[in-house]
Each structure stands twice: as C-alpha cells, then as structure tokens.
Amino acid sequence: MKKILSIIAAAALITTAATAQVSSEVAEKVYKIMESTDNNLAYHGDYSATISLVVEKPGKPKENLQFKIFERTDAKLMTLVQLFPEADKGKGYLRNDENIWSYDPISRKFTHTSIKEALGDSDIKLDDVEQDDTLWRDNYEVFAYEEGNLGKFPVDIITLKAKTKEPSYAKSKFYIRKDIPLVLKEEDFSGSDRLMRTILIPKYSKVPAGYVGTQIILRDELNKGEQTQQVISDLTFDALPDKIFTKAYLEGLN
C-alpha cells in the first residue's frame, strides 16, 4: 500500500509540474517583457529586407538560399520572394491576415499553406521571419518565469505554452536580456517536452528604428549537426505600395 501511495504521489507531482502556471501578476509581467522585446525591434509598420540562409547538414555540402521579404506588421500582410538558387527564383509566399499561399512560378499556381511551412530545406519556418505584434497574449499562456544568466548577461527566463494552433511548437523557452529586452536564445519543445530546436541570436545591430537580429542560428535538436544560419541585410523602413501584398505582384515577377 505504501508503494502504491508513493507512486500516486509521484504521479500527482508530475501532473502538477506539467500543468504549473504562474500568478496573474507574474503573467502580466511576462507579457510586458515579451512585448518589450517586440517594441525594441525595428520592425514596426512597413519594412523590407533580404534574408540569406546557409543550411548545414552532415555529409552534405552547404546550401545557400536567399529571399526578399516585404511586411506590413500592423495588418498581417507579408510577401516573401525567393531570389536564390536560380532554379527556385520567383517562388514565393503571400499572407493576408489568416490566409497564406505559396506560389509556384512554373505552374503559376497558388496553394494554401501554413505559417509553419519551412523555407526550402532549412530549419526556418514562415512564422520565424514574420513579425506579429499580437503574438504573445493571443497565442500563448505563461507557464514559468525565473531569473538567471546566459553567458555574461543577466536574463529573464520565460517559458510560454501555446494555447492556439498558430505557434509551431507546444512550448517555448526564451532567454531575454534584462538591460535591453532582446531575445538571446530560444528553445522550442514538443507536447511531450522533447527539445526540438534551439535558436541563438548572437548579433544585434542598432538602427534608427530599433534593434535587428542580423545573425540568427537555428539548430535542429532531433538531427544533430543540422543547423541553419540566417543573416538579415538591406533593411528599409519606407512605406510599401499596397500592390506588393497581392497575388498579381508575385505573378508579375516572372
């Protein structure tokens, strides 16, 4: 009987840990920290940039991909156009609110797709390059909060649990600088708490509009040795014409 009670108690502790949540005061503090990370970034309103990816997989040569992104962050509008390799030039993605399409310039057809779709053979998904000001409160609940250090930086360590189908992962842990709220590291987990992916942001650049993570490393934790390095360049924050966020724009590129 004592053994059975011990097993029941252990199971109860595991269940409690799996469903643990913070107080409403801590949750509000966490949401404000996450929103501060967005506010510190340069992506507000319209912007465009070049995204260069280097995909590394054991036993294979490095693969280079390049995209041009146009986004209107306050209206959930995004257009992404592949620039390289030449064989895939003109492929693209279009987002208008909750509708997301991929575009094939050879067939000239649009296909409904998901924000969770990967870019080429990389570890980067569409929602990694999109900037969404309503992401945190709408799609996550606060699971845990603590303070710690990451290298030389004091950080807030925040674990968020997905409450909608929008996030690509069931749970994500963020390591955020205390002095300037910027994400330095992110760990993404499955529903069974298996580490799926690690994101490192070792380099930020300061521009007049805010900070830009100009170097990002995404590691596939299921396939050791696989990673994608992302470099952001050619940033502009000028107002974009509405036609860029249309199917006709993608069709007209080829």
PLM-predicted stretches and their roles:
Residues 4-14:
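Sec-dependent N-terminal signal peptides
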Residues 16-20:
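Sec/Tat signal peptide C-region and signal peptidase I cleavage site
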Residues 21-36, 42-45, 61, 97-170, ...:
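Flexible, processing/modification-adjacent segments and terminal tails
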Residues 40-46, 206-210:
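Edge/loop elements at the starts and ends of beta-strands within beta-rich repeat scaffolds
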Residues 42-56, 77-79:
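A short, Trp-centered hydrophobic/proline-enriched beta-strand micro-motif
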